[in-house]
């Protein structure tokens, strides 16, 4: 813990119970997205993602080779507006991309058509507008809305071998291989039921694999030699002999091995061992007899040619039978394909048999003899059926499919995976397929089929990689450019003779690129509305990994295996945090310490172990790199020198847990918490919770609403400050220095670097609305004079307390039933919590209204609204907008607006009368913005945007003046501070140097050689200084000039900053066409805890507030303190989240120890500081490492007091996940806090004052209020809108709909026999149009409700039947039924 405090990230001390001291800091939680986007935009000065994409598309040539378009360079502009401006004005925070394009016109030789030289070169800069820019908080502002692009977890390109059960043949396994590129055609190799090897391209019809090899230019013999060992058979004295090669006989042999004399040297059915084989060779065995029965059914590897006539007797791949063998005996020797060798089968031979027929037919139809050309034509016909084909086009097509970098891209990752799997040595820059890749893949598949190869696991993290924002954007850019490339090629073909006049701009349409990118950000599945409920939800949203999205899985078709936790997730992907529901397992989160390497594979950190000794060297490994290694868990016992204590260690190897000798262990986990993600590592005692409940706990922490006053948990895990460190909500000091001035809105820090003094200014944001309508507010946590280090948190954001995440409140809880009110997880709450605003939160809602230009005139924002009472507009200002501070109730006018009525042209007389009497009211309609039914609160801000060319109203002018004044004041403050600092430095400089002449300074006279008093120097003004400085030496004068110049430069910088801010303020508002004014009103609503609100702990223990009980009626402790919350004890055993019990024990200990520290404060004896320090040291000495002891000893008295004051409200603990407090430590703590060992206490009933029969578990638990607020859900309707077709009330709160009375509810009333109620439900309360109208009329007049009519549903049914051409007539029962 101590090492964390040295960084001064937080300003709080926690008693840390870690077993292992931290080796490395937790890496920045958002670094993956930052690095990825920086790479894309070339901010790291390497070859960027943008450059790569442009170079992959350009140059573009026209078909006649007369013109070529080349990419020269690109330059990135600066954003036009700030982030805040973009959010307020509804714009996209983006930059323009300037692309330099060169168009070259070539000279051509008229006769040959060859390029001779360059005729003309034109260069032009082309602007690509609006490339969204990542904000410093790792999000994007698109149309004023903050969005996040989540990382995609997809299948890595490369080759993968699979084994699946056959869908057609029972109990048969089918083996397949796939070559997956990042871009281009997929290649599938598969066996069929008859053991023929086929290939498919892009899931088209399959062709025998040999067809593909032939299309690649291989001859029959070449293919046989590539796939089969060639065995030469010699003919001697009517015997077939072959060389003895032990490798061919390693398995059990089905025939006797005889030497050339016919003597049996090894019997059939016995295994030939290596030793025996060596002995046979030693004994001089060279030739053995090849049995004729085996030779039958073998195939020739090479054609057999008659030596005399030169005629081909038998072609290669001829199946040998007795008659053929008889003819072959005349030859001295011949070659056969040994398909009985180890690791091969007859698949290729079978494929040849299959493709022979096809080629014969093609030969006849195409009149081509070359088999390679025919194979290319066959593949072309499969890929493009029905199209005419020429052999050259077919060959070019096959070549384009896999060997053209424009069409096919394996990427660096794919090439690495291919090389690794197939043992190739192709250079990594070759990202297209090679012939060797295809051949080796087929060979390896045959090996796999014959039990020699290794089948891949597609869920292994070595076969899945992460595509982060940079790569996703590069892919989108490539798509846009590819569209543009096609358009340019089309334009090239339509160009006429005057090529000299063509400019790059005529050919390139940058809109194609922009639309593709903006489409990705607005409509892509991976670009999501940022979850901004609290800092944790924001951080975890940016660390999310999704298997969905373009090029990923489809959630309806994803099976169980993909969703399951895999052994390789250990330390890489959190096994706990994933949504409940249909996305479970498809959306994951990175583990806390995980990193992603440049190839997109997730790495986990380990410490190296050498000869049983743990070193301090930390290595990051991918799932592939850690294969086969023995890894010990972090909880392994290690002595002080780092040696592993026990001889046998429980270690992991390839996902299996085994006992390994300590010398065999190569790695050890960095720490126990590396397994889980950020949200799960915030749950104390996670190791005691059931995984399902932990999942709910981590998901619900993300829904916790920021409360009015944040307070950090008493029982934390130490992760709270890490999240605050990396969340942008907190303000962090860019550079170190001293706090010069602090107020509610700004912090000024004065510091000094190599160049000299500087002043940094930080502003606090107040009352901003987040995406989830929660309130975003910052407040300083430093005081004037504090020394601040770079990176230190100087202001808390929402849900933060002293630089720590604080998403809930510590509450005193009792596990006990309370009159049945906490039945089924309901929660009983004390009124004190509501009175003290413990769980009160502020929510901000934005309402906007536009004034448009219509054909009848312009709409006007005004207070002058027709047919509205004076008191209804009393709260509006002169401009017709609600004043700031107005209390808004449902139905009140927020902004007054009138719209012109379309009317007949008035006569001249009417116009004159109107001009005299100003009779305007009758010709406008009230179109004001009203507060909705559930909206109640206070107006906190108003933003007005006016289109250029239209007059600004008073309110807009006032707000502009106010903002300008604030900027001026801030600038003035900074200049004053600079001046003061400059004078201090100058006075300090002059007070140390002797005078060169007699001088009068202030009221004193000084002789030459004396030094002036600093107090006198401070009294004189600047003008006197300029003359006084001449009385000093040249060195001093130079130092003075340097100082003066430095401060002048700093002031110039401040002026430039100020001018830039003013310029932004004065920019014209950009509004959509037709809109002349836009008004946004922000209303803050205070939401107190109510019955129906959802609350939860951190262990998945959630519930609804069922009742709020007066404080006096709640159960109370012997000391008179009443309990805050009563929870149902039955919610614990079946849920198995015991962590909450331990948390409440430790929380109570924290409170009791805090009381003891408070007592020391209250006594205030002579040496109470000594007593305080002793008490704090006693508490800190309980954990195993006791790392805070040294820290407390080193604190000054003032610092100690600060920490002690914080502890007096409850001693704060950090119990990291999987390293929690153990039994011995708990018993020491119970003893110190003077609590019974069972953690239970006597309680008294608040209403009767009687002692409750059993002792009750009382503790302190951290409770959260979730954003499922009852105020936003309660809704009622009497009459309202109806659905057009069915005439039934619409559904949902948003549409002001009714409650659905469905099928099952109807059954309930039928079963109950409530006929009249049922009739009412199905008619006048639903879709009996006339009936409901007459019922309403009758009720308003106080008459009886008339009889009901026919529901509209009946007419819908009859009309449906009529639409099917059925004549439907309705007869009344009174009519005679003829």
From Swiss-Prot:
PROSITE patterns: RNA_POL_BETA (PS01166). Gene3D superfamilies: 2.40.50.100, 2.40.50.150, 3.90.1100.10, DNA-directed RNA polymerase, beta subunit, external 1 domain (2.30.150.10), DNA-directed RNA polymerase, subunit 2, domain 6 (2.40.270.10), RNA polymerase alpha subunit dimerisation domain (3.90.1800.10), RNA polymerase Rpb2, domain 2 (3.90.1110.10). GO terms for cellular component: DNA-directed RNA polymerase complex. DNA-dependent RNA polymerase catalyzes the transcription of DNA into RNA using the four ribonucleoside triphosphates as substrates. NCBIfam families: PRK00405.1, rpoB. The RNAP catalytic core consists of 2 alpha, 1 beta, 1 beta' and 1 omega subunit. When a sigma factor is associated with the core the holoenzyme is formed, which can initiate transcription. This is DNA-directed RNA polymerase subunit beta. The gene is rpoB.
């Amino acid at each position: 813990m101590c090492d964390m405090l040295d960084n001064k990230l937080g300003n709080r001390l926690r008693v840390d119970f870690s077993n292992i001291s931290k080796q490395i800091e937790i890496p920045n939680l958002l670094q993956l997205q930052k690095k990825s986007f920086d790479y894309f935009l070339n901010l790291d000065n390497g070859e960027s993602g943008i450059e790569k994409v442009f170079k992959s598309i350009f140059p573009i040539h026209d078909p006649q080779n007369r013109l070529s378009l080349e990419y020269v360079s690109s330059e990135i502009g600066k954003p036009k507006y700030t982030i805040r401006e973009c959010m307020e004005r509804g714009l996209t925070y983006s930059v323009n991309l300037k692309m330099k394009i060169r168009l070259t016109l070539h000279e051509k030789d008229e006769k040959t058509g060859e390029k001779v030289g360059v005729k003309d070169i034109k260069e032009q800069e082309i602007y690509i507008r609006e490339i969204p820019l990542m904000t410093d908080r790792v999000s994007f502002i698109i149309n004023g809305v903050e969005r996040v692009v989540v990382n995609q977890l997809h299948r890595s390109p490369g080759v993968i071998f699979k084994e699946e059960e056959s869908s057609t043949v029972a109990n048969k396994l089918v083996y397949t291989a796939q070559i997956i590129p990042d871009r281009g055609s997929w290649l599938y190799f598969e066996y069929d039921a008859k053991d023929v090897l086929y290939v498919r391209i892009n899931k088209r019809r399959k062709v025998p694999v040999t067809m593909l090899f032939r299309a690649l230019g291989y001859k029959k013999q070449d293919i046989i030699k590539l796939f089969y060992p060639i065995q030469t058979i010699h003919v001697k004295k009517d015997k077939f002999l072959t060389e003895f090669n032990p490798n061919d006989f390693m398995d059990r042999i089905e025939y006797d091995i005889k030497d050339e004399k016919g003597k049996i040297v090894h019997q059939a059915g016995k295994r030939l061992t290596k030793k025996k084989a060596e002995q046979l060779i030693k004994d001089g065995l060279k030739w053995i007899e090849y049995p004729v029965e085996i030779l039958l059914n073998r195939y020739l590897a090479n054609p057999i040619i008659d030596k005399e006539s030169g005629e081909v007797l038998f072609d290669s791949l001829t199946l040998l039978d007795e008659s053929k063998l008889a003819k072959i005996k005349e030859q001295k020797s011949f070659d056969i394909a040994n398909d009985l060798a180890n690791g091969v089968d007859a698949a290729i031979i079978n494929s040849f048999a299959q493709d022979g027929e096809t080629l014969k037919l093609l030969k006849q139809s195409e009149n081509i003899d070359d088999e390679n050309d025919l194979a290319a034509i066959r593949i072309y016909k499969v890929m493009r059926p029905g199209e005419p084909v020429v052999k050259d086009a077919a060959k070019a097509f096959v070549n384009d499919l896999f060997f053209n970098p424009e069409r096919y891209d394996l990427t660096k990752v794919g090439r690495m995976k291919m090389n690794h799997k197939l043992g190739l040595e192709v250079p990594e820059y070759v990202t297209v397929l090679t012939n060797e890749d295809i051949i080796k893949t087929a060979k390896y598949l045959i090996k796999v089929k014959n039990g020699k190869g290794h089948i891949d696991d597609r869920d292994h993290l070595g076969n899945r990689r992460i595509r982060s924002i940079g790569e996703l954007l590069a892919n989108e850019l490539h798509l846009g450019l590819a569209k543009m490339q096609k358009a340019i090629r089309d334009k090239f073909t339509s160009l006429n003779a005057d090529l000299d006049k063509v400019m790059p701009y005529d050919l390139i349409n940058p809109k194609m690129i922009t639309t593709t990118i903006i489409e990705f950000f607005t409509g892509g599945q991976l670009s999501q509305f940022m979850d901004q409920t609290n800092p944790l939800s924001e951080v975890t949203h940016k660390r999310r990994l999704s298997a969905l999205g373009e090029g990923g899985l489809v959630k309806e078709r994803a099976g169980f295996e993909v969703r399951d936790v895999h052994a390789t997730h250990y330390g890489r992907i959190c096994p706990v945090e994933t949504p409940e529901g249909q996305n479970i397992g498809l959306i994951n989160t990175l583990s806390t310490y995980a990193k992603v390497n440049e190839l997109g594979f997730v790495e986990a950190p380990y410490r190296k172990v050498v000869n049983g000794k743990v070193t301090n060297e930390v290595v990051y490994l991918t799932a592939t790199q850690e294969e086969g290694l023995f890894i010990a868990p972090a909880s392994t016992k290690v002595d002080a020198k780092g040696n592993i204590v026990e001889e046998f260690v429980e270690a992991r190897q390839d996902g299996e847990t085994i006992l390994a000798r300590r010398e065999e262990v190569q790695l050890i986990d960095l720490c126990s918490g590396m397994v889980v993600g950020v949200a799960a590592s915030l749950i104390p005692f996670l190791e005691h919770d059931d995984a399902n409940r932990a999942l709910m706990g981590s998901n619900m922490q993300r829904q916790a609403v920021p409360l009015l006053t944040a307070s950090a948990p008493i029982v934390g895990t130490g992760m709270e400050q890490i999240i605050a460190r990396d969340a942008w909500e907190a303000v962090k000091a860019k550079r170190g220095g001293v706090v010069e001035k602090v107020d509610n809105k700004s912090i000024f820090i004065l510091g000094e670097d190599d160049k000299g003094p500087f002043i940094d200014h930080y502003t606090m944001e107040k009352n901003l609305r987040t995406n989830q309508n929660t309130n975003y507010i910052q407040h300083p946590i430093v005081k004037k004079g504090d020394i601040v280090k770079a990176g230190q948190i100087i202001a808390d954001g929402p849900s933060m307390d002293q630089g720590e995440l604080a998403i809930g409140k510590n509450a005193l809880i009792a596990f006990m039933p309370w009159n049945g009110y906490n039945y089924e997880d309901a929660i009983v709450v004390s009124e004190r919590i509501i009175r003290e605003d413990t769980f009160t939160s502020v929510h901000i809602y934005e309402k906007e209204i536009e004034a448009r230009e219509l054909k009848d005139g312009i709409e006007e924002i005004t207070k002058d609204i027709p047919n509205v009472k004076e008191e209804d507009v009393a709260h509006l200002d002169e401009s017709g907008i609600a004043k700031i501070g107005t209390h808004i109730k449902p139905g009140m006018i927020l902004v007054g607006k009138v719209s012109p009525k379309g009317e007949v042209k008035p006569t001249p007389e009417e116009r004159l009368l109107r001009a005299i009497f100003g009779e305007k009211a009758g010709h406008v309609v009230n179109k004001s913005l009203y507060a909705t039914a559930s909206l109640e609160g206070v107006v906190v801000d108003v933003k007005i945007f006016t289109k250029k060319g239209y007059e600004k109203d008073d309110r807009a002018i006032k707000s502009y003046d106010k903002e300008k004044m604030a900027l001026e004041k801030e600038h003035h403050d900074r200049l004053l501070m600079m001046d003061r600092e400059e004078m201090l430095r100058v006075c300090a400089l002059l007070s140390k140097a002797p005078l060169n002449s007699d001088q009068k300074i202030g009221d004193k006279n000084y002789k030459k050689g004396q030094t002036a008093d600093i107090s006198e120097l401070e009294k004189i003004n600047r003008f006197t200084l300029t003359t006084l400085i001449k009385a000093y030496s040249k060195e001093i004068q130079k130092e003075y000039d340097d100082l003066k110049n430095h401060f002048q430069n700093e002031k110039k910088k401040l002026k430039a900053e100020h001018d830039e801010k003013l310029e932004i303020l004065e920019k014209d508002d950009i509004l959509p066409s037709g809109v002349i004014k836009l008004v946004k009103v922000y209303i803050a609503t205070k939401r107190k805890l109510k019955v129906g609100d959802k609350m939860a702990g951190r262990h998945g223990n959630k519930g609804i507030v069922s009742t709020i009980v007066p404080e006096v009626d709640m159960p109370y402790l012997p000391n008179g303190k009443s309990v805050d919350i009563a929870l149902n004890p039955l919610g614990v055993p079946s849920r198995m989240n015991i962590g909450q019990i331990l948390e409440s024990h430790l929380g109570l200990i924290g409170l009791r120890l805090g009381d003891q520290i408070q007592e020391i404060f209250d006594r205030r004896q002579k040496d109470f500081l000594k007593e305080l320090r002793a008490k704090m040291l006693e508490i800190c000495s309980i954990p195993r490492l006791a790392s805070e002891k040294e820290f407390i000893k080193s604190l000054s008295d003032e610092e100690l007091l600060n920490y002690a004051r914080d502890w007096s409200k409850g001693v704060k603990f950090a119990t990291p996940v999987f390293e929690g407090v153990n039994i011995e430590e708990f018993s020491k703590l119970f003893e110190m806090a003077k609590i019974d060992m069972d953690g239970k206490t006597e309680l008294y009933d608040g209403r009767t004052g009687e002692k409750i029969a059993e002792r009750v578990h009382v503790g302190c638990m951290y409770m959260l209020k979730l954003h499922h607020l009852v105020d936003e859900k309660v809704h009622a309707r009497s009459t309202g809108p109806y659905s057009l077709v069915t005439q039934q009330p619409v559904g949902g709160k948003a549409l002001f709909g009714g409650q659905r009375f469905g099928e099952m509810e109807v059954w309930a009333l039928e079963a109950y026999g409530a006929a009249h109620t049922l009739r009412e439900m199905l008619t006048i309360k639903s879709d009996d149009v006339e009936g409901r109208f007459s019922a309403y009329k009758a009720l308003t007049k106080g008459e009886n409700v008339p009889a009901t009519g026919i529901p509209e549903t009946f007419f819908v049914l009859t009309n449906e039947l009529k639409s099917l051409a059925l004549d439907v007539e309705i007869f009344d029962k009174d009519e005679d039924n003829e």
